């Protein structure tokens, strides 16, 4: 989901509340739990977003979600506020914005690393070390296996794509030969 000024504002406020207590990671984990609950049970989201549902029913539903997911008071309040202001539609963007802002606070850079086969620990460490050297932040790798890459790796980090795959090399060569 695309970031908006609204989602960014809520995410920034949430980071400001979580950071002093060292709760940035646990807050993100809880945000992911809420996101998964909405994804697994779309009716839950629809009920909360419904303007026709009685306030006491919504309060009970929010209380039930908070208890079931063992949410912090801050996240219970956030859900209530988003529901009350009819801004639940921004929740996914808020989660993405929160992750980005929390990473800045924690000095992290996230990288999606795609390869044709699983990477061994030594290669993962080498990639992480190079990214840390390049960006000056601790790298968190999100690994994915995509057999269609044929070989090599593609790294997506900080809005950039570093493509060292055989597939992209073959594509470049074909373009060169066709020109």
Swiss-Prot record:
Task: State where the protein is found.
Answer: Cell inner membrane
Q: What is its main location?
A: membrane
Q: What Gene Ontology cellular-component terms does the record carry? A: plasma membrane; proton-transporting ATP synthase complex
Query: Keywords on this record?
Result: ATP synthesis, Cell inner membrane, Cell membrane, CF(1), Hydrogen ion transport, Ion transport, Membrane, Transport
Look up the coiled coil feature and give its residue ranges: none
The answer to whether UniProt assigns keyword Signal to this entry is no
Topology of this chain in the membrane: Peripheral membrane protein
What GO MF annotations does this protein's record show?
A: proton-transporting ATP synthase activity, rotational mechanism
User: Source organism's superkingdom?
Assistant: Bacteria
The entry's function note states: F(1)F(0) ATP synthase produces ATP from ADP in the presence of a proton or sodium gradient. F-type ATPases consist of two structural domains, F(1) containing the extramembraneous catalytic core and F(0) containing the membrane proton channel, linked together by a central stalk and a peripheral stalk. During catalysis, ATP synthesis in the catalytic domain of F(1) is coupled via a rotary mechanism of the central stalk subunits to proton translocation. This protein is part of the stalk that links CF(0) to CF(1). It either transmits conformational changes from CF(0) to CF(1) or is implicated in proton conduction.
Family indicated by similarity:
Belongs to the ATPase delta chain family.
Can you state the subunit structure given in the record? F-type ATPases have 2 components, F(1) - the catalytic core - and F(0) - the membrane proton channel. F(1) has five subunits: alpha(3), beta(3), gamma(1), delta(1), epsilon(1). F(0) has three main subunits: a(1), b(2) and c(10-14). The alpha and beta chains form an alternating ring which encloses part of the gamma chain. F(1) is attached to F(0) by a central stalk formed by the gamma and epsilon chains, while a peripheral stalk is formed by the delta and b chains.
> What is this protein identified as?
ATP synthase subunit delta 2
């Amino acid at each position: 989901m695309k970031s908006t000024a609204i989602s960014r504002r809520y995410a920034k406020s949430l980071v400001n509340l979580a950071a002093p207590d060292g709760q940035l990671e646990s807050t993100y984990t809880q945000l992911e739990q809420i996101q998964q609950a909405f994804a697994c049970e779309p009716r839950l989201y629809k009920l909360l977003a419904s303007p026709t549902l009685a306030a006491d029913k919504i309060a009970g539903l929010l209380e039930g979600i908070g208890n079931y997911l063992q949410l912090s008071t801050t996240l219970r309040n956030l859900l209530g506020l988003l529901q009350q202001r009819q801004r639940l539609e921004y929740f996914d963007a808020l989660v993405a914005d929160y992750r980005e802002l929390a990473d800045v606070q924690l000095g992290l850079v996230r990288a999606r690393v795609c390869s044709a086969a699983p990477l061994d620990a030594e290669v993962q460490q080498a990639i992480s070390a190079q990214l840390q050297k390049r960006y000056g932040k601790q790298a968190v790798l999100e690994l994915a296996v995509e057999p269609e890459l044929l070989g090599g790796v593609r790294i997506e980090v900080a809005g950039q794509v570093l493509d060292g795959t055989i597939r992209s090399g073959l594509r470049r060569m074909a373009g060169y030969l066709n020109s």
